[in-house]
Design a protein with these regions (language model features):
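Short, Lys/Arg-rich amphipathic alpha-helical interaction segments
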Residues: 94-98
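Active-site scaffold of zinc-dependent metalloenzymes
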Residues: 2-51, 66-67, 71-85, 89
Length: 98
């Protein structure tokens, strides 16, 4: 998968694959995180291709909620997880490229 930039609501987010990804605030190893101030999405590059795509979709949901001003929900995993899972399934089951 090669996506270097993605436009989310008019904001261009850079997408980076990184080894041994550590989330800056929690200092924990994560599969992905979004830096809203830098408009950047980081994804662990040791994941399988499928998990990289799923993680990208998950982080896109975070960024989409952020960019729409959904301050109460952009970081709520109870909202982001099901939306991300469903969006990935729709794309995958309909053979839409990610």
């Amino acid at each position: 998968m090669t996506i270097n930039k993605i436009n989310i609501g008019g904001v261009k987010y850079a997408v980076y694959l990184k080894k041994n990804l550590i989330e800056p605030d929690s200092h924990q190893h994560v599969w992905g995180y979004t830096d809203y101030e830098k408009s950047a999405i980081y994804i662990e590059n040791k994941l399988s291709e499928q998990h990289i795509k799923q993680t990208l979709i998950h982080e896109l949901v975070h960024a989409m909620l952020w960019e729409t001003g959904a301050v109460d929900s952009y970081n709520d995993e109870k909202i982001v997880n099901p939306l991300g899972n469903m969006l990935y399934a729709v794309l995958h089951l309909n053979n839409l490229k990610i």
